[in-house]
Amino acid sequence: MNTLDTNNIKWSENVIIADADYIDRVAFDLIVNFERMINRRIQPADMAQWAVCIALDGGLREGEHETQVVLIHDKQSMAMKNFRPANYEKDLNAQAFKDDKLGEFIISSYPTEEKMVGKDDFLLDVARTVCNTKEVKRVMVIPNSEDGDAYDRLREILRKVDDDDKRITLFAMQPMPGGNFRQEILGYSLMNALGISANEIK
C-alpha cells in the first residue's frame, strides 16, 4: 500500500514521524503500570495533546507554526487501542487541529505491509526524505527502539545529514546510543497525554 511518493509531498517546517503501533503499545504499558500505582482508571491518550508535547520536546516554541504528524502503522491495525481519536482512516488521516500556542497540526496515517515495504523501511525512507528537505527545520522521530534495528539504521541515516539549520530529535523510552541528533524521553509526552501528573507519582 506504500504508494506514497515521499519526494512529491510538500513538507511543513516541522515534521513528526512516528511508528504508531509502537507508541500505542507504550501507552498501553504506561496505562497498566500507572493504574496500579496511582489506583485510578486512566483514559486513552489524547492524540492532539501528545503531538503538542512532542513538538515542544522537539524544540518548537510559541508561534503560528504548521506541523505535520506522520503516523505509520501495520495495515492489519485499523485503529489505535490506547489513543483518542483512534481510527486511522476515519478519525486521523487527513485531519488537522489548531493549538492555541503552536498553530496547526496536520495528521496523515500510512498503512504498511511487510510484503511490500516493511514499516521500519518506510519510516526510515520518510525520515531520510524529510531530513534532506531544505524547508524542514525540525524533525521529530519516534521509531520502535525496542524491537529490530530501526533505531540503529536511523542513527546511520542521520549521521549523513549535513544541515546545521535542522534540529532533529529522536524519542525513546530510555537513553539510547547518541549521534547526529538530540534525544528526548518518549514517556513524558505520553504521560502528559494520558493525564498523569507528576504529583500523582511522587
Residue ranges and their predicted role:
Residues 1-12:
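Acidic, polar low-complexity linker/tail segments
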